[in-house]
């Protein structure tokens, strides 16, 4: 069995409305759904130990089909940053065209820039920014490889699984 495609990434945010506005103003990603989670569910499913916890959930549509699922909990815990070699998620990434133009756009929007656009050894360009809560976001221009991966990705996966990467499969 195989998954069909990538669905979503969940991010806990400090301010629901600010997150909606940020992802719309900065990246053009609209809010497409909102739900309020009942207190008993916040306690049992999310494990928030408080008298009357709440959770607002929103779905922000990213061009291409994936979604950012945002959560605002009450009460909140303070964010904690970890080093990249910590096991777990490190960042989200958006495919873009022209990373320098995106860099300039985000500087003008006042977004915290972590790194300037640079070229990888494989030829794509990328840079990192942070959202208002400090979540790391990569913007990457894969160049021609975007189309190669989109259209030939399944074939490449089949070939590589049987070829140069076969030792990773049992």
Feature roles, as predicted:
Residues 39, 75, 121, 143-146:
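A short acidic/small-residue loop/turn micro-motif
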Residues 40-45, 76-81, 148:
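A short, acidic/glycine-rich surface segment
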């Amino acid at each position: 069995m195989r998954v069909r495609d990538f669905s979503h990434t969940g991010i806990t945010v400090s301010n629901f409305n600010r997150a909606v506005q940020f992802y719309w103003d900065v990246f053009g990603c609209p809010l497409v759904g909102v739900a309020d989670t009942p207190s008993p569910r916040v306690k049992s499913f999310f494990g928030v130990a408080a008298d009357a916890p709440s959770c607002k959930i929103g779905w922000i549509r990213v061009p291409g089909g994936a979604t950012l699922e945002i959560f605002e909990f009450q009460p909140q815990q303070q964010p904690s940053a970890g080093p990249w070699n910590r096991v777990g998620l490190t960042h989200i990434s958006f495919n873009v065209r022209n990373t320098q133009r995106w860099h300039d756009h985000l500087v003008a929007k006042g977004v915290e820039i972590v790194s300037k656009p640079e070229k990888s050894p494989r030829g794509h360009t990328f840079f990192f920014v942070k959202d208002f809560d400090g979540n790391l976001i990569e913007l990457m221009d894969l160049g021609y490889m975007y189309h190669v991966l989109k259209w030939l990705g399944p074939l490449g996966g089949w070939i590589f699984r049987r070829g140069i990467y076969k030792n990773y499969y049992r």
